[in-house]
């Protein structure tokens, strides 16, 4: 973002959130190219044709020469701005990528320049970026909680809701009209939330723009949620202060109190949130609300959220999208893990003079288990095994060198071990590694027209076992004690890595 500040300071229009002129600047598309990496439309399109920034210059010149542009899907035949139809989608992609960078500017600059960010060094802390930092938080807090709400956040049915929520920050009407143009050109934007059900251009090319819009939409409702929690508990929150403009939310809350049908007193709403043990986390479209309160309080939360979405955001959500579960009896399905709170019993014999008695200690423990069935399904889809989990050869890799084949299998295995290192039970993870190991052996045996047994006998099974041992396990063998109860094996406890910033593809079965 320092690069953005250096370029944008040349033009004072950004201070008033007027971003439409930036669409005509070439360096914006250069930033989009750098951040998009190999997924950028500036690199390649569906036809594998290479593109450079020269096409951006042609596009900008065409925009300068255009006197007017009809922003209506019903008049697409009259719109000769983009020329031929095969160029139309390409130009849409280029402008949308540049626009995605532009709309992120005010929020990124505000986060960097925020006194709270400088005071708490939020930006400098790389560990806070890790999605796995959520699980140590679970381990610390969930042992003392009773109930949890699993919430599937609804997304806007009407695209105008996205524009209306963004207009509080972006004062430039031209930019908002351009945003409407993108939204109505690709109407099936919710395919980003359920990518397996759609092959739309959204899910493949415009993820940056629409992920931003979706996260901003969620941030709007979360902001009021945090505000109510702060007002009720009189605690200061720093997690969202750098991103929110309090004046707007005070006005929204006054409107919220007026339109609510289930309460007329703002104090009653605050009383609902008076829970010092309330914790909230979110990843993508799923959020977790955990509390030490009773079942009655969690039902109040459930119906408050349903009414809040409907009254304030015109979103209708079914009650079955919010599940109320007791932590001691149900597992939490979140980010590729089954998490639960279970009781560990330990019996201690105590001897006092001539009498002895047993003491049964029950200790709560936060347990995380790898979701084995979705992982096997993902491996079967990638042709590493069948649907029953039996390893098969990867036939498309038989033309590669032996070292390349082993390297590819080993990289997948190390990535899985890295992502699922926090699992408290490694048996499922070892089963996945075993499938990959035998799939690698079958692939090499098929390439050399041999059997797996003969191939392993010639190479030695220790070779593959040594290769599939991760670097982390080698380091842990030096710094952590060995578990004497498992034949001198390595430490098998949970180990969370705080350098993971996105969910693993094989963990995301949605």
From Swiss-Prot:
> Could you tell me one molecular function GO term of this UniProt entry?
RNA binding
Biological process according to GO: mRNA processing; RNA splicing; tRNA processing
Family named by the database record: Belongs to the intron maturase 2 family. MatK subfamily.
Pfam families reported in the protein's UniProt record? Intron_maturas2, MatK_N
Origin: domain of life:
Eukaryota
Q: Sorted alphabetically, which HAMAP family does this protein's record hold?
A: MatK
Location in the cell reads: Plastid, Chloroplast
Report the protein name in the record: Maturase K
Which species does this protein come from?
Mammillaria haageana (Cactus)
Known function: Usually encoded in the trnK tRNA gene intron. Probably assists in splicing its own and other chloroplast group II introns.
Where is the major localization of this protein? plastid
Q: Kindly state which keywords UniProt assigns to this record, in alphabetical order.
A: Chloroplast, mRNA processing, Plastid, RNA-binding, tRNA processing
């Amino acid at each position: 973002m320092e690069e953005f500040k250096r370029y944008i300071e040349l033009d004072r229009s950004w201070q008033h959130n007027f971003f439409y002129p930036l669409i005509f600047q070439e360096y914006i598309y250069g930033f989009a190219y750098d951040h998009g990496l190999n997924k950028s439309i500036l690199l390649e399109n569906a036809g594998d044709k290479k593109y450079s920034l020269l096409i951006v210059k042609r596009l900008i010149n065409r925009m300068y020469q255009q006197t007017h542009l009809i922003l209506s899907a019903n008049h697409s035949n009259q719109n000769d701005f983009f020329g031929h139809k095969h160029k139309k989608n390409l130009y849409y992609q280029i402008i949308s990528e540049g626009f995605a960078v532009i709309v992120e500017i005010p929020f990124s600059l505000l986060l960097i320049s925020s006194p709270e960010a400088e005071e708490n060094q939020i930006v400098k802390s790389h560990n806070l970026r890790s999605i796995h930092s959520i699980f140590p938080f679970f381990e610390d807090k969930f042992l003392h909680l009773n109930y949890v709400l699993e919430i599937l956040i609804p997304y806007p049915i009407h695209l105008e809701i996205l524009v209306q929520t963004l207009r509080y920050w972006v004062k430039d009407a031209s930019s908002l009209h351009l945003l409407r143009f993108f939204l109505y050109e690709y109407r099936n934007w919710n395919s980003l939330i359920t990518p397996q059900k759609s092959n739309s251009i959204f899910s493949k090319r415009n993820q940056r723009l629409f992920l931003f819009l979706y996260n901003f939409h969620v941030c709007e409702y979360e902001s009021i949620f945090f505000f109510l929690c702060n007002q009720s508990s009189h605690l200061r929150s720093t997690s969202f202060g750098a991103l929110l403009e309090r004046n707007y939310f005070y006005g929204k809350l006054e409107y919220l109190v007026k339109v609510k049908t289930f309460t007329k007193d703002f104090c009653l709403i605050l009383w609902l949130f008076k829970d010092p043990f309330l914790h909230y986390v979110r990843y993508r479209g799923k959020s977790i609300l955990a509390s030490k309160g009773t079942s009655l309080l969690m039902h109040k939360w459930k119906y408050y959220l349903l009414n809040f979405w409907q009254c304030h955001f015109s979103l209708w959500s079914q009650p079955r999208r919010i599940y109320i579960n007791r932590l001691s009896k149900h597992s939490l399905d979140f980010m590729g893990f089954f998490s639960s709170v279970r009781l560990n019993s330990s019996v201690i014999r105590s001897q006092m003079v001539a009498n002895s008695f047993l003491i049964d200690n029950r200790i709560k423990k936060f347990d995380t288990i790898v979701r084995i069935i979705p992982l096997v399904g993902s491996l079967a889809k990638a042709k590493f095994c069948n649907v029953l989990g039996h390893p098969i050869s990867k036939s498309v890799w038989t033309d590669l060198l032996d070292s390349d084949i082993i390297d590819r299998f080993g990289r997948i295995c190390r990535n899985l071990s890295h992502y699922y290192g926090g699992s408290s039970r490694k048996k499922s993870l070892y089963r996945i590694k075993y499938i990959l190991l035998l799939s690698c052996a079958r692939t090499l045996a098929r390439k050399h027209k041999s059997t797996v047994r003969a191939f392993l006998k010639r190479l030695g099974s220790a070779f593959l076992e040594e290769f599939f041992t991760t670097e982390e396990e080698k380091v842990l063998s030096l710094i952590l004690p060995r578990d004497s109860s498992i034949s001198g094996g390595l430490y098998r406890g949970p180990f969370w890595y705080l350098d993971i910033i996105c969910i693993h593809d094989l963990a995301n079965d949605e």
